[in-house]
Amino acid sequence: MTHKIAILGASGYTGAELVRLIAEHPNMEIVALSGERKAGQSMAEVFPHLRHLDLPVLCKIDEIDFAGVDLCFCALPHKTSQEVIRALPATLKIVDLSADFRLRDPEAYRTWYGNEHVALEQQAEAVYGLTEFYRDQIRTARLVAGTGCNAATGQYVLRPLIAAGVIDLDEIILDLKCAVSGAGRSLKENLLHAELSEGANAYAVGGTHRHLGEFDQEFSALAGRPVQVQFTPHLIPANRGILATTYVRGDAQTVFQTLAAAYADEPFVHVLPFGETPSTHHVRGSNHCHIGVTGDRIAGRAIVIAALDNLTKGSSGQALQNANLMLGETETTGLTMAPLFP
């Protein structure tokens, strides 16, 4: 069976990544691509690397006949996404890549994103899209909320450790480096080549990054009590990739064994041999996450490092993984490509 797919926001990085991935999916056909400001243009004009594909011309959302769509990916900015999704057919399966449906508490959404939620009915039904931990709910969901790329990386490290009770919940430090594509395709002064190249900088320092809302929600639910992590992201002059270094109080071997057991049967999350550390080079362009564990010279502490591609495993690859489950496909279909190297 061929599933008819629409992608809203196809002129952005995550939208283009979805097109790249779905083009190789044997049971999906892209029937509609929206790009409000680029309507009427071909995808080859907007993204020349997709020139070889036979794709629909970009259109406006209101030009799409959703009666002929089995599943819709929404790769629009937050706030815009909720306004669009609440107007879509109530039976349409949707995977949202924005932040609009990640937080279950409307007040938490207002706190972190600065505006009221206008699609509360859809927010209430949305399933959080961290595939490895919400598979059963995702299979039967109508609306799945993709995670933040930083939030996904941190959770792959910390969820099993919190659930197993093997680390001190009051002493978690997460230091994360993210490539510039995580900021999207819009023109911003700080993302100009001359501003970014040959340098790196911290941002959202002091606990202000919006993905902390996801950490608070997910970790506190796991622990059964409030859990807050100390999280500082850094922007690095790379196109793709996240490298997250997490410092925890706990026995390093126990941390390693807990993570190795948690992901032993996972197709996309891989725990390296003890003492090895991952690189963003080794996951680039793939749906894989690599995790490495090592001890520290300070007794009773462990260092856990995770690497993934922010556009693939951190966003569009995760979205396709979820869509496969929603449509009854094998979870790994269209996602088994090896990482690009060098």
Curated annotation (Swiss-Prot):
Question: Any idea of its EC number?
Answer: 1.2.1.38
Catalyzed reactions: N-acetyl-L-glutamate 5-semialdehyde + phosphate + NADP(+) = N-acetyl-L-glutamyl 5-phosphate + NADPH + H(+)
Q: Which GO terms describe its cellular component?
A: cytoplasm
Q: Which residues form the active site?
A: C149
Where in the cell? Answer: Cytoplasm
Report the family membership.
Belongs to the NAGSA dehydrogenase family. Type 1 subfamily.
What job does the chain carry out?
Catalyzes the NADPH-dependent reduction of N-acetyl-5-glutamyl phosphate to yield N-acetyl-L-glutamate 5-semialdehyde.
- Indicate what this protein is called per its UniProt record: N-acetyl-gamma-glutamyl-phosphate reductase
Q: Tell me which species this is from.
A: Ruegeria pomeroyi (strain ATCC 700808 / DSM 15171 / DSS-3) (Silicibacter pomeroyi)
Taxonomic path: Bacteria, Pseudomonadati, Pseudomonadota, Alphaproteobacteria, Rhodobacterales
